[in-house]
């Protein structure tokens, strides 16, 4: 059983939460009563200690998982120790931790026991993006816009279009990976035990992506997790028009700023001074990240959280428990958006890194009644709950 968190620890957590946009008192972190529909910020320690008993003996649960082929289940005390570390670093998500949704499977997942894999995955994404970015910006030869208009150029003097398209879509996919890396950092899942390293990698990745402000993203993302699907409270949710294009436009405006555009202009100018052609900058530094942003929005916001069509769909709230989850094979889910389409699992286990979300999907199965209830209203497609 992990040691109890004293008030000094919880005060520090409250202070971190305040910086992240949540006005939580120390008692709000650990000593709230059982959740209601309006307030689901219950006692974290009670919740996870009770899950120990719910397992009916952690060793038996491990044996059961071994026979069914499910991922290994750590005992509750080990899980509590890891999650306690997560909470002490200031990554508490009260709206989700206090929810009863998925309580029957919540205790089965434990975060990685080491930060090595998280850091290695993040660095692999960043360095692979950097290598392809350099090749795309400085080594690919594109005809100028004027040459394309007039048709007065020799194709053999330039990089073949199949090569260009392969580089473009590969780089766009890696841009998406940069954002997913930052998203993991905001949840502390790159380096759970080393907050400074975790936040450095997240901030660095989002600067390479499009010079977003990491602290602003972190604050708004906490708001999203605490008020998922609530009009006017969730910064990712629509503001009264759930149609895809107006929602995407508002989504982009929510996170953009003049200072960000100034930094992008500075970055592009620097690339030109180093010899990058304008057409390469336009294609690989402008079009690719914009397409990536739409990919992230579509699979990480619109599909999981959009309300069902109807006369009052603009007023329907989409609590996180109603998030849709893809049933696509793991490889396709990865190629789609780094498993960002496994969205119910992400909200149930916000301390799971993106590369372990397929594990969470296996653990979730269809054991939670909320999955099947929500499935009745989900759109008839491959996207459903608890796949």
From Swiss-Prot:
InterPro entries: FA_desaturase_dom, Fatty_acid_desaturase. GO terms for molecular function: oxidoreductase activity, acting on paired donors, with incorporation or reduction of molecular oxygen; oxidoreductase activity, acting on paired donors, with oxidation of a pair of donors resulting in the reduction of molecular oxygen to two molecules of water. It catalyses: echinenone + 2 AH2 + 2 O2 = canthaxanthin + 2 A + 3 H2O; all-trans-beta-carotene + 2 AH2 + 2 O2 = echinenone + 2 A + 3 H2O. Involved in the biosynthesis of ketocarotenoids which are powerful anti-oxidative molecules. Catalyzes the conversion of beta-carotene to canthaxanthin via echinenone. This is Beta-carotene 4-ketolase. Residues 1-78 are annotated as: Disordered. GO terms for cellular component: membrane. Its EC number is 1.14.99.63. Disulfide bonds: none annotated. It comes from the Eukaryota. Residues 43-53, 65-78 have a biased composition (Polar residues). Keywords: Carotenoid biosynthesis, Oxidoreductase. One of its GO terms (biological process) is carotenoid biosynthetic process. Pathway: Carotenoid biosynthesis.
């Amino acid at each position: 059983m992990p040691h109890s968190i004293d008030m000094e620890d919880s005060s520090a957590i409250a202070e971190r939460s305040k910086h992240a946009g949540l006005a939580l008192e120390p008692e709000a972190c650990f000593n709230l009563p059982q959740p209601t529909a309006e307030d689901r910020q219950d006692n974290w320690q009670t919740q996870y200690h009770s899950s120990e008993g719910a397992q009916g003996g952690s060793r038996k649960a491990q044996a059961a998982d071994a026979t069914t082929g499910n991922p290994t289940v750590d005992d509750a005390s080990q899980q509590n120790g890891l999650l306690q570390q997560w909470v002490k670093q200031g990554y508490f998500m009260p709206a989700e931790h206090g929810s009863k949704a998925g309580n029957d499977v919540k205790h089965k997942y434990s975060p990685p026991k080491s930060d090595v894999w998280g850091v290695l995955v993040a660095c692999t994404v960043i360095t692979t993006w950097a290598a392809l970015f350099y090749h795309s910006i400085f080594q690919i030869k594109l005809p100028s816009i004027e040459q394309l208009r007039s048709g007065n150029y020799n194709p053999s003097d330039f990089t073949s279009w199949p090569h260009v398209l392969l580089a473009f879509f590969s780089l766009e996919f890696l841009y998406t990976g940069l954002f997913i890396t930052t998203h993991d950092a905001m949840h502390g899942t790159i380096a759970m035990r080393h907050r400074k390293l975790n936040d450095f990698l997240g901030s660095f990745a989002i600067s390479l992506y499009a010079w977003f402000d990491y602290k602003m993203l972190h604050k708004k993302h906490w708001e999203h997790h605490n008020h998922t699907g609530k009009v006017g409270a969730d910064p990712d949710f629509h503001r009264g028009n759930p149609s895809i294009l107006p929602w995407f436009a508002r989504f982009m405006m929510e996170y953009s700023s003049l200072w960000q555009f100034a930094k992008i202009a500075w970055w592009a100018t620097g690339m030109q001074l180093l010899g990058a052609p304008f057409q390469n900058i336009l294609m690989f530094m402008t079009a690719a990240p914009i397409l990536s942003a739409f990919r992230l929005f579509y699979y990480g916001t619109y599909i999981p959280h959009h309300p069902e069509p109807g006369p009052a769909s603009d007023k329907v709230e989409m609590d996180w428990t109603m998030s849709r989850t893809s049933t696509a094979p793991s490889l396709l889910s990865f190629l789609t958006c780094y498993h960002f389409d496994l969205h119910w699992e992400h909200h149930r286990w916000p301390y799971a890194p993106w590369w372990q979300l397929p594990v969470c999907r296996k653990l979730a199965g269809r054991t939670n009644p909320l999955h099947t209830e929500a499935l009745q209203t989900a759109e008839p497609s491959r996207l459903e709950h608890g796949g």
